[in-house]
């Protein structure tokens, strides 16, 4: 099992949690981004840079992931593709996307897009606070404990 991170939009506090977990659990974490970013020296943490462009990082993640891998993303269409390929997706607020909930989440996202396109001000998500950070860490720990077998 590997962890892939849609890194361009991933909050720094979430990356820090991922870096600590990578070393503690000895799980490979790969950040995929369209620009260089600093990562700590670790045999478990990698950075894959891709060219700039719409969904280039997303497409690379889908191409590289294997069934059973975990993808960290707030991008709901990417999460849906990951699940279709047999992977798992976790958003930075600690919500695990599953086969059971992804369709309704995708429908709500599409509805909100339609509302915004018609001029309705829907606002964006609030900044990640302590409770979301804790929810993410807890969900990540549960997932890794259940699914990762260190070699």
Curated annotation (Swiss-Prot):
CDD domains: PIN_YqxD-like
InterPro entries in UniProt: UPF0178
One Pfam family from the record: DUF188
Family assignment from sequence similarity: Belongs to the UPF0178 family.
PANTHER family linked to this entry: UPF0178 PROTEIN YAII
The protein, known as: UPF0178 protein Spea_2958
Source species of the chain: Shewanella pealeana (strain ATCC 700345 / ANG-SQ1)
Lineage summary: Bacteria, Pseudomonadati, Pseudomonadota, Gammaproteobacteria, Alteromonadales
């Amino acid at each position: 099992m590997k962890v892939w991170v849609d890194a361009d939009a991933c909050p720094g506090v979430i990356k820090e949690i991922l870096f600590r977990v990578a070393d503690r659990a000895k799980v490979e974490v790969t950040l995929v981004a369209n620009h260089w970013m600093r990562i700590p020296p670790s045999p478990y943490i990698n950075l894959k840079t891709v060219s700039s462009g719409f969904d280039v990082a997303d497409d690379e993640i889908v191409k590289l992931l294997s069934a059973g891998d975990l993808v960290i993303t707030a991008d709901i269409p990417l999460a849906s593709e990951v699940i279709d390929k047999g992977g798992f997706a976790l958003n930075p607020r600690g919500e695990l996307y599953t086969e059971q909930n992804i369709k309704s989440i995708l429908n709500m996202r599409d509805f909100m897009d339609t509302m915004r396109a018609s001029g309705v001000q829907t606002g964006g998500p609030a900044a990640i606070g302590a409770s979301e950070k804790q929810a993410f860490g807890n969900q990540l720990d549960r997932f890794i404990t259940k699914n990762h077998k260190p070699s």
